[in-house]
Amino acid sequence: MSIFDKLKSTAGQAVNAAAQSLGSKRERFTFAALPESLAEMQALPEASLDTPFKTAALTVLALCAYAADKSIGTEMLNWLRGPRPLNGQEISFLNDRFRDGKTYLPFTYVAGSTPDNNYTPTQPYTITVESNHVSGEEQGYMKLFIPCGGADDPRPIKMRQRGSDGKWFLWEQYLLTGVRTPKAADPWA
């Protein structure tokens, strides 16, 4: 093994050890208001994208923006995805998830949102992001979980770290899956 290979191996082991040492970690992010433009999002302290937790929290905000304005939400999501913007299939998927008035979906990840209050979050807006023992299993990626007011288990979201600057970007999100029907839309409520 060459010196370079040893250095590379040591660096990789350090990243894996750091990721796995996260274990069960929980971070809460509080926002006075939801950003209404990419510039407003980029002005937030979390926009440094220096931890996967920050990027995950901003992803929820971007999805909330998408529910209100697809163009602004797309801008935000593309920025959070770094060098890998949304493709046509991914945009079609997003549009499908918000169909039939399901614009409440991303708000289920904001504290205070429940089916009984039609997923109306409390203010200030708080988003919790969690890691567990499997979060850092894949080098350069971090699988995190966001508790959902409309489901029993937190939903996964995956980030990827860019090697050149250490920033974390959105890789995959599984946040727009089915949740309990909001009370106003439930004929049996």
Question: What are the functions of these language-model segments?
Answer:
Residues 2-28:
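Glycine- and small hydrophobic-rich membrane-insertion segments that are intrinsically disordered
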Residues 4-11, 68, 123-124, 135:
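Large, modular interaction/toxin scaffolds in secreted and membrane-associated proteins
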Residues 6-8, 25, 54, 70, ...:
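Context-gated lysine
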Residues 7, 112, 117-122, 181-183, ...:
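Surface-exposed, polar/charged interaction patches used for macromolecular assembly or partner binding
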Residues 20-111:
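Core segments of small alpha/beta cavity-forming domains
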Residues 63, 80, 123-128, 144-146, ...:
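Generic hydrophobic secondary-structure signal
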Residues 92-150:
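Surface-exposed, charged secondary-structure patches
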Residues 147-188:
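Short beta-strand edge/turn micro-motifs at domain boundaries
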